[in-house]
Amino acid sequence: YGGDAVFLLAAVLDTKQLHDLAEEATSLGLESVVEVRTEDEIEALDMSAMDIISINNRNPDSFETDIYTSVRLKKFVPNDKIIVSECGIETGKDIDLLMSHGIHAFVVGEPLLRVEEPGRALAELLHSVEGVRSRR
């Protein structure tokens, strides 16, 4: 019945709120996942209490996705943070590209929701990721 992490949105919370909530999460034994969409949001963060930075690839104005958002924004995140890429990840090639740029984890949703057998689709997606196949 416990949680492992809290999900904090940089677009909604100010810098002090983000820092205070991340510190409180740490004091409770929780990880902090902070979602960012822009360079400005990243630069405003005090990342000392933040463990995981999740880069949202969806443009909030147009709702279009571009996985290169993660590639562009990763360079503004310290190397000691875990980086997650979310939205717009459709194929194993997308994951391979992101992995080649040092992205650690991925949120894949829409491609699994559009099919009748999401478990099978996930297995096929993972099988198509070169980085996953080479670890076996």
Regions found by a protein language model. Name each.
Residues 24-26, 50-53, 71-72, 101-102, ...:
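Short, hinge-like loop/turn segments at secondary-structure boundaries
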Residues 32-36:
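Long, charge-dense, solvent-exposed interaction surfaces that engage phosphate-rich ligands
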Residues 13-23, 27, 37-48, 60-80, ...:
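Short loop-to-alpha-helix "cap/lid" segments that border enzyme active sites
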Residues 1-8, 74, 78, 83-85:
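Long, low-complexity, intrinsically disordered polar/charged segments
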Residues 3-4, 28-30, 49-51, 79-81, ...:
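Short, well-ordered coil/turn segments that N-cap beta-strands
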Residues 73-76, 99, 112-136:
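C-terminal helical cap(s) of enzyme catalytic domains, especially alpha/beta-barrels
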Residues 1-17, 54-63, 101-122:
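Glycine-rich phosphate-binding active-site loops on the catalytic face of alpha/beta enzymes
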Residues 1-2, 37-49, 85-108, 120, ...:
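Catalytic cores of alpha/beta
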